[in-house]
UniProtKB/Swiss-Prot annotation:
UniProt key word Nucleus: no
Secretion signal, residue range per the UniProt entry: none
CC annotations in GO: cytosolic large ribosomal subunit
Gene: rplQ
HAMAP family: Ribosomal_bL17
Quaternary structure annotation from Swiss-Prot or TrEMBL: Part of the 50S ribosomal subunit. Contacts protein L32.
Domain of life according to the entry: Bacteria
Protein name (record): Large ribosomal subunit protein bL17
Pfam family, one: Ribosomal_L17
Length: 141
């Protein structure tokens, strides 16, 4: 019996699940809206909500905890500056999960997961190297 066992396995190993949620959390903070399957979106919500709460705390220990989870300096900086400032007055409920129909290939329930009061300009942001880094590299060469 599995009484009181929380969370979904999603058909993958625990290490795969951890990596998947890390990648999805980084993508959600970067683009502020992503499309995924409904069970993954529902499992991702508490992960990102806790990260935003860490960003609101803003101290060094919280920053190190967020970096241990996300492993991306740029995203941690965005989390602790822009995202944390946006939700200073809000106590939880930073994430919205909307149903988005079914996927035609396998009839999986799809969902859009997004930050509440999101920045619309962040969606579709370049996933490649940052323009600042490219400019620095060209100046150094």
């Amino acid at each position: 019996m599995r009484h009181g066992v929380a969370g979904r396995k999603l058909g993958v190993t625990s290490s795969h699940r951890a990596a998947m949620f890390r990648n999805m959390a980084v993508a959600l903070i970067k683009h502020e809206q992503i499309t995924t399957t409904l069970p993954k979106a529902k499992e991702l919500r508490p992960v990102v909500e806790k990260l935003i709460t860490l960003g609101k705390r803003g101290d060094l220990h919280a920053r190190r905890q967020a970096y241990a989870q996300l492993r991306d300096d740029v995203i941690v900086s965005k989390l602790f500056s822009a995202v944390a400032d946006r939700y200073k007055a809000r106590n939880g409920g930073y994430i919205r999960v909307l149903k988005a129909g079914i996927r035609h290939g396998d009839a999986a329930d799809m969902a859009v997961i997004e930050l509440v009061d999101r920045d619309v300009a962040a969606k579709g942001q370049d996933s490649g190297p940052r323009p600042e880094a490219a400019a620095e590299d060209s100046l150094a060469a």
